Amino acid sequence: MSFYKNKQFAFTLIELMIIVVIISLLAGIAYPSYQEIVMKSRRVDAKGALIGLENAMERHFTESNTYLGAGTVGGNTGAPTVFFASSPTQGSVVYYQLTISAVTATSYSLAATPTGLQANDKCGILTLTSVGVKDIVDEANGVTVGNCW
């Protein structure tokens, strides 16, 4: 005869609720960090696209001896005709619109404007000039060019 009671091994409701709370706290901490990393990777892609557009502008200058005529608006500004108009350059989702502005025969300014899911990026609009000056416009308080470029 056995006087031992059968022990059952299982989770109690309280233990399960503690696990759910811990997972919720971890997710609450991790998700904003994840979003920041995703935005940063899209920003890196936009910087690469701006540099690609800069190379296309130089190629256009080599062929035409002017920067004029590289855009869709009056041939000088707006979306580029010498390169892709958005970043990423492939796919259907657009995170940055590329534009050309302030074009003369010897200078230009390029911009990557965040759109869609990237519209709330703390760096705002990334700009690049024909002399290689990198800048940001409409950035959040305390954000510097060094943080974004």
Language-model features, listed with the residues they occupy:
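N-terminal leader/signal peptides at the extreme start of proteins
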Residues: M1-F11
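Internal alpha-helical transmembrane segments of multi-pass membrane proteins, especially GPCRs
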Residues: F9, I14-I18, M39
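Periplasmic/extracellular, small/polar-rich flexible segments of pilin-like filament-forming proteins
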Residues: T62-W149
